[in-house]
Amino acid sequence: MRPNNRAINQPRPIKITRHYTKHAEGSVLVEFGDTKVLCTATVDESVPRFLKGQGQGWVTAEYGMLPRSTHSRMQREAAKGKQGGRTMEIQRLIARSLRAMVDLEALGERSVTLDCDVIQADGGTRTASITGACVALIDAVNGLVDNGTLTVSPLKGLVAAISVGIVDGTPVCDLEYVEDSAAETDMNVVMMEDGRMIEVQGTAEGEPFSHEELLTLLNLAKQGCKRIFEAQRAALAD
């Protein structure tokens, strides 16, 4: 029996609140059950040094967790003086995922930075970050079109991400913390709206998984992402 009696292919309740803060060009509070992430998009009229004069833009991301986003207080990474390996891995994943939805040449020589700050963690923070940051990025880019900075939108479509895994021998979708901590296999899947995969990260924490189980997990991810795309579209239509 899953927490809250969810079906194996059923994500947690998804809530996407746009324009959550007033200063950023795009801001979203995304909620997957008890996991809550604030995603903001900032537009800069410059690009990193390695892209100067190349005629294309850049999309990057930063990720962090507030000290009491978890059961016990975490020390701020700023207090430690450096980012942890997990943080760097996650923000690179977020950035790669979001670059897949943007024509960087059409964006022009400007950058969009997505800041993803976890305010409450109950599993799936990186996938929630990608899902929310996608909507924040769309709002920021649409703002460039609306104010005449861009004449053509560089957006290619929606991006969503979800966790899947095997818990007590059963493949399931959108793991919360109690499931994630007990999973024999843990996987994160990032997809485009048209069904193409951007990234698949999978690890057997215990018993190795079979090819058939891999296909089952990918199918669960596809079903879960379909519901996420619906939630994103509904939020953007509001």
From Swiss-Prot:
PANTHER family: EXOSOME COMPLEX COMPONENT (PTHR11953), EXOSOME COMPLEX COMPONENT RRP41 (PTHR11953:SF0). PROSITE patterns: RIBONUCLEASE_PH. Pfam families: RNase_PH (PF01138), RNase_PH_C (PF03725). Its EC number is 2.7.7.56. It comes from Actinobacillus succinogenes (strain ATCC 55618 / DSM 22257 / CCUG 43843 / 130Z). Homohexameric ring arranged as a trimer of dimers. InterPro entries: ExoRNase_PH_dom1, ExoRNase_PH_dom2, ExoRNase_PH_dom2_sf, PNPase/RNase_PH_dom_sf, Ribosomal_Su5_D2-typ_SF, RNase_PH, RNase_PH_bac-type, RNase_PH_CS. Belongs to the RNase PH family. Keywords: Nucleotidyltransferase, RNA-binding, rRNA processing, Transferase, tRNA processing, tRNA-binding. It catalyses: tRNA(n+1) + phosphate = tRNA(n) + a ribonucleoside 5'-diphosphate. Gene3D superfamilies: GHMP Kinase, N-terminal domain. Phosphorolytic 3'-5' exoribonuclease that plays an important role in tRNA 3'-end maturation. Removes nucleotide residues following the 3'-CCA terminus of tRNAs; can also add nucleotides to the ends of RNA molecules by using nucleoside diphosphates as substrates, but this may not be physiologically important. Probably plays a role in initiation of 16S rRNA degradation (leading to ribosome degradation) during starvation. GO terms for biological process: rRNA catabolic process; rRNA processing; tRNA processing. Phosphate binds at R86, G124, T125, R126. One of its GO terms (molecular function) is tRNA nucleotidyltransferase activity. This is Ribonuclease PH.
